[in-house]
Amino acid sequence: SDFLEHPDVKVIIDSIKILKKEFGDDVPIIGKTMGPWTLAYHVFGVETFLLGSVDDPNETMRSLEKLKEFTYLFGEAQVDAGADVLTVPDHATGDLVSGQYYQTFLQDIHSEMAERFTVPLILHICGRTVDRMPYIAETGMHAFHFDSKNSPQEAMDAVDNKIALVGNINNPETLYSKDTDDVKKEVFDCLNAGVQLIAPECAIPLKTKAENLVAINEGITDWLAETKS
């Protein structure tokens, strides 16, 4: 495919091969392939795409069905290169669309992805997403990576143990500008709620202090020591 030969695509595939060779025996290699809703924002423009979903929902579905093939193509190439897990960002966020929109346009597509890919999938949607978490929990995805705009406890309640949660340490305030104690407090909040995988809520600001990232792991270790004592 010409798509897979594009330099922007090849550099990711080649990077995964290098990571797999150097670190594959020690840590999971996690790839990333954008979902069709996010791709549609880039292809059509956010406003045009969202207005079109109101004016002609059938055309929107046809667009998503075509765009999802790029999600598969890129994702499968990463798996072939050595990715053990794939993150699927698909930004049907509560800031832009309703939970009902998610159910109508994306739930079935995400369920199909969970069946079609051969590795575990982590769905990511930024923003306020509690109203669509019950639908996400039914997709068969292995985990949902959620934003700090949703509290850990309400997120756990919303998914009702039907899907693992990943998150949701705040990036722009806590990790970027606060200290390690603040990071550990958020780690404790997540663990006390039952969140299974503790991680930053989204892409980490490049100037985040390394000690704040290390504090995530230290917070987990401290929590385990306290709960076992």
Predicted segments, located by residue:
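Active-site loop segments of alpha/beta catalytic cores
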Residues: 4-229
